[in-house]
Amino acid sequence: MKPTKRNKLTIASLLLSTCFLLVPGAHAQDNVIAAKDVEWGYLNPARGDKSPGAADLWGDRTKDTATGMLVRFNKGFESPPHIHNITYRGIVIEGEMHNDDPNAAKMWMPTGSFWTQPAGEDHTTAANDKTNLIYLEIDEGPYLVKPSKEHFDNGERPINVHADNMVWLQKSDLVNIAANGVSVAYLWGETSSVYGTLVKLPKGFKGSIKSNGDEFKAVVIKGSLNYTQNNTPRQIELNAGSYIESSTAAHHSVENANQSETIVYVRTSSKFSVAD
């Protein structure tokens, strides 16, 4: 069939439409999970309801891959001394947590506190409040619990940072801040590769978090955000424990409509920016 002007126009239109689909948009490859939609299981399925609850937000804790998960503990929970096969990081979302050497006095860490637990290091974990929830992150898996007798020294040392000792900066090489009242706290990693920070958004903040790399993961640690998706009027309420992810450059439109600050944990492979 001989191409006509109409056929050529149709083909050109299809090609142009395809090009627009391939260009990374403001919300391309976004994945948003509200805390209320998280699917829960057990951190140690063999122990059933005696085990802390666990929910993968990204990755798979049972496989050899990086993973971010929520873990919840009942009041009075205290583990026996144990080790893990891999290093993990923990951030308290709700309640009070203790994580230290088996002989250490209890230091209860509230919302916004951060700790690291090196692979092979003997320790116990305890929870003090009625409801206790943390975000736990690993760079490799699977996440396993092993007896203390198998302890080893992997060369790393544990860190416990109480929320009151967090250092907040309004100017940093971690992130470009172009909004009043926004501050960040460095937690781990190298800014030339993958790193983690806490971002504090003041009450009334309305703006965007712009990610530029191929990995951007954010978890609401304290407070809540209204998230506008795909440039539509539709807003998603993201309470503590909710999750945002993008794998291309993206603008994440967020609003803190609370009467208090909201804190978000960000894991990223590239410098990001916050603007109102």
Language-model segments: residues:
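Hydrophobic, ordered structural segments
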Residues: 90-154
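A short, N-terminal "cap"/entry segment at the start of jelly-roll beta-barrel domains
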Residues: 27-67, 144-193
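Bacterial N-terminal signal peptides
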Residues: 12-21
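Ligand-binding loop in jelly-roll beta-barrel domains
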Residues: 119-142, 214, 239, 248-272
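Glycine- and acidic-residue-biased ligand/ion/polar-headgroup-sensing regions
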Residues: 74-77, 84-102, 202-205, 209-231
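Bacterial N-terminal signal peptides that target proteins for export
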Residues: 2-13
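Conserved short histidine dyad/triad with adjacent acidic residue
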Residues: 58, 64-83, 108, 116-120, ...
